[in-house]
């Protein structure tokens, strides 16, 4: 039996629910009712814990798929800044205009740089899926990421986010 998610006074939990609501449907953070965990817009839909966690992991996986092909590595506060910019960007999106002016979906993998190492890293994040990212038409968006790694670091990383993982080869995404 699945239980519904109810933010019992936790500001962090309400922020997470707000983030997911902004990403998944129109509205704002003020549409969230803190007493029952549902939004006033589309309140017939219940957020289950498993559904919420799956949405978070899918969204983070999409971010990883956009960052890895560019040779990005997270250090210090870069991850925090990226997520902050992402939340701000999502709150400004207009539901009728989720794509660029030419009305084509934004391709998160525009560069065809060094693929072998990058594909290997992507397979660590999602071993059962291809390294290309499919962008849903009603959820297309762009992210502006400031590169912190040089070409040499991108092809031969010595330190950074992608170090040796103790769970290499295992599927890290919750079902």
UniProtKB/Swiss-Prot annotation:
Q: What GO cellular component term, any one, is given? A: endoplasmic reticulum
Q: Where is the signal peptide?
A: 1-29
Q: Which UniProt keywords apply?
A: Cytoplasmic vesicle, Endoplasmic reticulum, Golgi apparatus, Signal
Mind telling me which InterPro entries this protein's record contains?
A: RESP18 (IPR024833), RESP18_dom (IPR029403)
Compartments where located: Endoplasmic reticulum; Golgi apparatus; Cytoplasmic vesicle, Secretory vesicle lumen
Its induction, per UniProt? Up-regulated by high levels of glucose.
Could you tell me the Gene Ontology terms of the biological process aspect for this record? in utero embryonic development
* Pfam families referenced in this protein's UniProt entry, alphabetically: RESP18
User: Keyword Endoplasmic reticulum, does the record have it?
Assistant: yes
Q: In which tissues is it expressed?
A: Pituitary, hypothalamus and pancreas. Highest levels are found in somatotrophes, mammotrophes, and gonadotrophes, and lower levels are found in corticotrophs and thyrotropes.
Chief subcellular site? endoplasmic reticulum
Task: Say what the protein does.
Answer: May play an important regulatory role in corticotrophs.
Family in the record: Belongs to the RESP18 family.
Entry protein name: Regulated endocrine-specific protein 18
Species, as recorded:
Mus musculus (Mouse)
What gene is it encoded by?
A: Resp18
